[in-house]
Amino acid sequence: MRVTGRVLFVLIAALTSLGAMSLQRAEQPASDKEIRIGNVMPYSGPLSEFGAIGQAEAAYFDMINARGGINGRKIRFITRDDNSDPATALELTRNLVETENVDLMFGSFGTPGNLATRWYLNEKKIPQLFVASGDEELSQPGAFPWTMGWQPSFRSEGRIYANYIQAYYPRKKIVVLWQNDQFGRMLYKGIQEGLGDLNRLVRVDIAFDIADQHLDGHISILKRSGADIFVFLGVPSTAAKVIKLAASMNWHPVFIVNDASASIANAMAPAGLENSAGVISAAFLKDPSDPAWKDDPAMKDWFAFMDKYHQVESTNNSAAVYGYAAAEALAQVLKQCGDDVSRENIMRQAASLKNHHPSVALPDIRMNTSPHSYLPIRQMRLVQFDGRSWQPFGEVIETAFTEGAAR
């Protein structure tokens, strides 16, 4: 455990039994001296590579506190390890609310854990803000007014890839390798929705588990299908293995990977830059390992932040950039709260963002929310890796989000 300023960074794999504790009322204001923020992350287990999100958020609030806090209040950020287990996520969240008396939960990772805690937090009127998941079920203000997403939705992202395939490769054969969880399913569902009648061109789709030891067998099956387009939907470490395996089999289809895997440092470079050349993705944040941004003022601020407040993590980690951007967005919400940092006003301000541009987001990406719109980021850009850098093409995409959100 480390304590820096007023930020508490705690990594706990499991909790002992919890005593019954009285809950703060939703309208109860935060302390005059601090705002207490709870967070749950997979610092261990199969998705531990995304623990970098929470670590960057902790460091960001260290920086905020070093600069005097927000509206005179310091930030106390308490983050814990759920090992990607929904039951543990619920137990930890209850403890953060009932024992640590957090004012809100922020940025907890993953669809299963956030779905497991959603009912509890809404029942107790605790803000569940900017969850680290693109599942639209976590952005339903009518049913769950205390839960709000942050990143572009998985389904809409999937529709972007489907629209790209229809526009550039309308009669080509497709294969899909997708992660066998809610994350992978929603991405693939978006592709299926976007392809419509062209789903007949999907020759093979294979679901894989995060710890799958048979990737070579999967790639062999996909190659034998004779497909022209290979869509991968999963995490960066697996994307690197898949791209490298395909190249080793002398198979060079049009490669599409999802945004979470579109990291030069975490996926393209480990796969081999030559092997990764030509990979297509969609993005909304700048890749810190992309030399295209080396002179960008916002990325210079990012590197300075990492050097001063977060030296334990690589400056090239895209997951860390995600955490930085999400924490920056929460800081904007808290600034808008002024002196009223009650839970109700925190939600009110979170639902009142107008054209907020995260500093490390791609140009023209904006956050907008309202009481009826809990998907803050509804824009992405198509990008292609040229062996060195991501090259954007086309315009900022919004139409897929309008269509993808329809139910």
Regions found by a protein language model. Give the residues of each.
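Extracellular/periplasmic periplasmic-binding protein-like sensory domains
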Residues: 246-322, 396-403
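Extracytoplasmic "Venus flytrap"
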Residues: 30, 34-58, 80-87, 109-110, ...
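Segments of small-molecule ligand-sensing domains
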Residues: 308-321, 331-392
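Venus flytrap/periplasmic-binding-protein-like
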Residues: 82, 129, 136-139, 210-211, ...
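Beta-alpha junction/loop-to-helix N-cap segments that form part of ligand/metal-binding clefts
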Residues: 28-30, 34, 49-55, 67-140, ...
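Periplasmic-binding protein-like
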Residues: 96-109, 129-131, 173-178, 226-236, ...
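Extracellular/periplasmic Venus flytrap/periplasmic-binding protein
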Residues: 91, 136-139, 145-251, 292-295
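Short, low-complexity disordered leader/linker segments with a strong preference
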Residues: 1-36, 404-407
